[in-house]
UniProtKB/Swiss-Prot annotation:
Name by which UniProt lists this protein: Endonuclease V
Family: Belongs to the endonuclease V family.
Protein residues bound to Mg(2+): D38, D101
Reported function: DNA repair enzyme involved in the repair of deaminated bases. Selectively cleaves double-stranded DNA at the second phosphodiester bond 3' to a deoxyinosine leaving behind the intact lesion on the nicked DNA.
Length: 198
């Protein structure tokens, strides 16, 4: 169990991070190398894999990192479980844009794991999540947006939710989502499960 005062402290930290987010258009068409990072668990061990993929050739290389995870799963505080391991797994990888399995600003405090990692590393990130954490879904011009307090913070394509982490914008998320679930995240997911079994 996590003490209330710690969660209140972490909320303040998230609000601070959200104030340092840079929302700007990156241009998915400019990405030559894209990275994806994911994590799998066995007991209290986390198996994180970062993948760097060449957009044109599809060639990729990866790095993995295994570490102990002591923070429980609490919705809205995923970064405490996963960000330390994810950051270790992507160290040294060559890429222009990082896709994180989790939310960006489509988060109650606009500070999901993709935002935390993006701000800490001062790097372009997009969060790609399998479920909605907050906000309302509104269909506009054949696109489903996630609205939070009257602001568009994400988009939904298929069953996945895309939101800016840092140094990208909603249009980047739309362009990414239109292409289908990112191959680099599929590879990262496959590798985490493979490494977990070894």
């Amino acid at each position: 169990m996590v003490e209330k005062h710690l969660l209140e402290f972490l909320e303040k930290l998230q609000f601070l991070i959200s104030k340092n987010v840079k929302i700007s258009h990156y241009g998915i068409e400019n990405v030559k190398k894209i990275c994806g990072v994911d994590i799998a668990y066995k007991g209290n061990l986390g198996f994180s894999v970062g993948v760097s993929m060449d957009i044109n050739s599809g060639d990729y290389n990866y790095k993995s990192y295994v570490g102990e995870v002591n923070f429980p799963y609490i919705p809205g505080f995923l970064f405490m479980r996963e960000a330390p391991l994810m950051i270790k797994a992507i160290e040294g990888l060559d890429c222009h844009l990082l896709l994180v399995d989790g939310h960006g600003i489509a988060h109650p405090r606009k500070s999901g794991i993709a935002t935390v990692i993006g701000v800490l590393l001062d790097f372009p990130t997009i969060g790609v999540a399998k479920s909605r954490l907050t906000g309302d879904l509104v269909n506009e011009s054949e696109i489903t947006y996630v609205y939070l307090n009257g602001e568009k913070v994400g988009v939904k394509f298929g069953r996945y939710f895309y939101s800016p982490g840092n140094k990208v914008d909603l249009q980047d998320c739309i362009e990414l989502g239109k292409r289908g679930y990112p191959k680099v995240l599929k590879i990262a997911d496959m590798l985490t499960k493979k490494i977990k079994k070894e």
